């Protein structure tokens, strides 16, 4: 600017001052960093986890003995209830029996058949790799980042899954990993998640990627274990952060004791998701609660669930209840109907089918 002024000394003073002010104004505008934009909220469905494909300890195991897939019966039941988001847990060992090998054709067909059936019914699917940051190799469990199981190995399977499902209109998101925890210091969850995001985006630039929190994805302890996830980079800017929460004393979801012995209150659920929701707002990020559930043996749990879901709904955070599926039997958290009769928790779930953007605080 000074060089320009010196070379134009013949310009009258009034014009010089005018130009200087205009230039300074322009300079300020071009050097001010753009404001960080928050997420654009739209109405999102709540739903359920439909379990079965992640069942069993034998890997890969036998279909319909060690594990199964949810059926059309489950899809129709929850679709008719208006719960149109399904989190589908699956095991890495089954969809890709050999590291960096091809996807198993039969297992892939089961997954695709389920996704296709959901698509024809207007039901959205989250593909949830239910592996906790680990995988069994020859019957022995290894953690990602160990000599036996590299970050590149898990990136490979997600690249192949993305190629297979990127054209589906009802994939709500790729759930990178269920509940990573106690990861290696040399290979933290942040580094793994970033590698998976980068790899997926080489083949699919559109589908949402769900990044679970570290430390079992705890919403309650999110700032402690998962604060650094705000620094993940997605060239498509389409990440959703996934937390889990349960209302028993240790937030494990075991519910070993009574409502009173678990020190639960009507506001336990709200109190435990507040740290996660506040983190989302502070960092202008989008979130999702992939697991929450209550027993059917005390109606007070239902009020705790109701209050939490209302809080989530009014803060534009949707979620999926844990759980449903054909093999749950007498599991007290299950919302699979018994003999055609709705479970008690269903009454609460039906009050909270979608988020309400106009109410978002």
Predicted regions and their residues:
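Sec-dependent N-terminal signal peptides
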Residues: 4-13
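N-terminal carbohydrate-binding accessory modules
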Residues: 24-85, 348
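Solvent-exposed loop/turn segments at secondary-structure junctions
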Residues: 51-56, 85, 91-96, 131-135, ...
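Surface-exposed, active-site-proximal loop segments in enzymatic domains
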Residues: 56-63, 92-109, 133-149, 254-259, ...
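Extracellular glycoside hydrolase catalytic/binding regions
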Residues: 63, 67-68, 156-159, 163-173, ...
